[in-house]
Amino acid sequence: MDIFTFMNSASALFPYFETCVKIGKQTSNLPAAVTFTRLRSAGKKAEADMFSATKGINTHKGAIFSIGILCSALGRLSRNQWKMPEIILKECAVIAEGLVDSDFSNLTKENAVTSGQKLYLQYHITGIRGQIEAGLPAVQYAGLPILKKGLANGLNMNDAGCAALLTLMVSTTDTNLIARSDITTQQKTVQTIKEILIQTPYPDKQIFIGKNLSPGGSADLLAICYFLYFLESEA
């Protein structure tokens, strides 16, 4: 996996995100459950396109889910105040209403396949599903405000994003980080970040690289923060 893998994946997924907006527009006068059902169908095709472009590497599976819902929310709100982050995130919650229960209520050790399903069974961690269903509070109240604050204080886009990413990591339970290590390591990492953030928003990246830690879930939330920031800036 390298930068070109991600570029190939992003290029393959661009039409999917356009489709998500169209689905939102087409179902804006229908129950949000209809929007979600159509999204899931489109998402399965997008996953296949991603794996085809990356030769089987998962680069954007989380983004297909979370940003797909975000794009459909924009479509549903396109006739109204659709560039206000709080309204968009509220619509995401409407689209995902009941998602955790519908996806996890019948899980067993035998039918749990994904890491998210297994972590829910073991620790009752709802992951990105819980975040989306709650209206992405980690984005609205943690990541996005820190991103805006950093930019307002003169940080460049990268450094403000780094500060936002670390804030997101301590504001959520990153299932990708747990899957790449274990829950004890995740908890210790969060505690380390909290201690470092008191001194500086830029910890040594070797803390993560040396242990092969990947906060992919928090990275997806950061992408949403950037998305909403640029969208609001254009309004």
Residue ranges and their predicted role:
Residues 29, 33, 53-58:
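Short, surface-exposed loop/turn segments at secondary-structure junctions
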Residues 40, 53, 59, 65, ...:
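Generic detector of intrinsically disordered, low-complexity, polar/charged segments
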Residues 9, 35, 39-42, 46, ...:
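Generic hydrophobic, aliphatic-rich segments that mediate packing or membrane embedding
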Residues 39-55, 201-211, 229:
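Short, hydrophobic/aliphatic alpha-helical segments
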Residues 54-71, 212-227:
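Conserved phosphate/anionic-ligand binding catalytic regions in large, soluble enzymes, centered on
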Residues 1-32, 36, 40, 74-206, ...:
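Phosphate-rich cofactor/ligand-interacting catalytic cores and adjacent structured alpha/beta frameworks
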Residues 198-235:
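C-terminal appended segment following the main domain
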